[in-house]
């Protein structure tokens, strides 16, 4: 499933950023980013096992909310000088693209 694969790719990117935050001893930031990043792919996977279409759509909505949570954290980290603008811009683009794909996928269910 394309949206799941993209979600996994995003989770890996967020995990790598979290590792850099850990090196700066920003453990809470790192853990929050990891959790929200993993939530994206986990909710797509869990929702795909739903017996009912509406339940799957609910999981996809949770997935989108996790994307927005990650995007918010990225913007805060940028403002704090923890991430470069170019990296944040690229990740925000990825989040937006994934959000649109999830929305389109949900509508087709």
Short names for language-model regions:
Residues 1-109:
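Amphipathic alpha-helical assembly/interaction segments
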């Amino acid at each position: 499933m394309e949206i799941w694969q993209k979600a996994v790719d995003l989770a890996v990117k967020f995990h790598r950023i979290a590792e850099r935050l850990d090196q700066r001893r920003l453990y809470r930031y790192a853990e929050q980013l990891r959790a929200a990043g993993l939530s994206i792919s986990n909710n797509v996977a869990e929702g795909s096992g739903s017996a009912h279409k509406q339940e799957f759509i609910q999981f996809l909505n949770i997935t989108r909310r996790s994307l927005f949570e990650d995007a918010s954290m990225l913007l805060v980290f940028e403002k704090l000088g923890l991430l470069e603008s170019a990296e944040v811009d690229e990740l925000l683009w990825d989040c937006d693209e994934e959000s649109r794909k999830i929305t389109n996928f949900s509508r087709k269910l």
